[in-house]
Swiss-Prot record:
Gene: cysZ
Similarity comment: Belongs to the CysZ family.
Protein name, as recorded: Sulfate transporter CysZ
Topology with respect to the bilayer: Multi-pass membrane protein
Record-linked InterPro entries: CysZ_sulfate_transptr, Sulfate_CysZ
Cellular component annotations (GO), alphabetically ordered: plasma membrane
Organism: Shigella flexneri serotype 5b (strain 8401)
Length: 253
């Protein structure tokens, strides 16, 4: 099926909503199963464990609040919960994406072919196995780019006052941008677009990508919904690629 998508770019909210629609398209659902299973097993188990630990972690986190901010404790407590969910959710979604990266790339490729009518390269299990080293190298590039920035932000959490007020906001913005990079990279990588060039392309539509990443980050924190977010985000990011980036960067048409 050739896509009814237009070349006019939409908001990141639109593409996130499209992800929920596209994930259930006939012919696409079978490529959703493996990423979905990885996400359900890892995120489901991780968040179950997290919720058993919150009553220990949150008081520890709040102990860093200085005396002069104690009067704001009733506001800072929910902010602390959100902070833990943000950091924890992003960490485990990163692990899930590492494990499911070859299948996410295949999902993006098949959806792009369906949306555009283009013919992708040979796929299948042997095609996936052949591409695994390249895909893992790409995931490593993302991790190396992300890690030092994440460490700086995590250090901010241990600064009294800043860690309970400014750091959660900065982490949310950072995770929104990183999740946009994570999911938009699958269609870019399918066309062998270098990692640096991909980031430059995303910056040309930074607001759209931040909107998409912010919604993905929020849904990653919500129990049950976060079990389905990986294939949904891959589909939404692929729709964005088709509308906004494919004409300039596509390797196969």
């Amino acid at each position: 099926m050739v896509s009814s998508f237009t070349s006019a770019p939409r908001s990141g909210f639109y593409y996130f909503a499209q992800g929920w629609k596209l994930v259930s398209q006939p012919g696409i659902r079978r490529f959703v199963i493996l990423p979905l299973l990885v996400n359900i097993l890892l995120m489901g188990g991780a968040f179950w464990w997290l919720f058993t630990q919150l009553d220990v972690w949150i008081p520890t986190f709040m102990s860093y609040v200085p005396d002069w901010l104690q009067w704001l404790s009733y506001l800072l407590w929910p902010l602390a919960v959100i902070s833990v969910l943000l950091v924890f959710g992003y960490f485990f979604s990163t692990i899930a994406n590492w494990i499911a990266a070859p299948f996410n790339g295949l999902l993006a490729e098949q959806l792009e072919a369906r949306l555009t009518g283009a013919t992708p390269p040979d796929t299948g299990i042997f095609g996936i196995m052949k591409d695994v080293p390249r895909i893992m190298k790409r995931e490593w590039q993302k991790f190396v780019w992300y890690l030092p920035r994440a460490i700086v932000l995590l250090i901010l959490y241990f600064i009294p006052g800043i860690g309970q007020t400014v750091a959660p906001v900065l982490w949310f913005l950072f995770s929104a941008w990183m999740l946009a990079i994570q999911y938009c990279d699958y269609p870019f990588d399918n066309h062998k677009v270098p990692f640096k060039e991909m980031r430059t392309a995303l910056r040309t539509r930074k607001i759209t990508n931040m909107q998409f990443g912010a919604l993905t980050s929020l849904f990653t924190m919500i129990p049950l919904l976060n079990l389905f977010i990986m294939p949904v985000a891959v589909c939404g990011a692929t729709a964005m690629w088709v509308d906004c980036y494919r004409d300039k960067h596509a390797m196969w048409r």
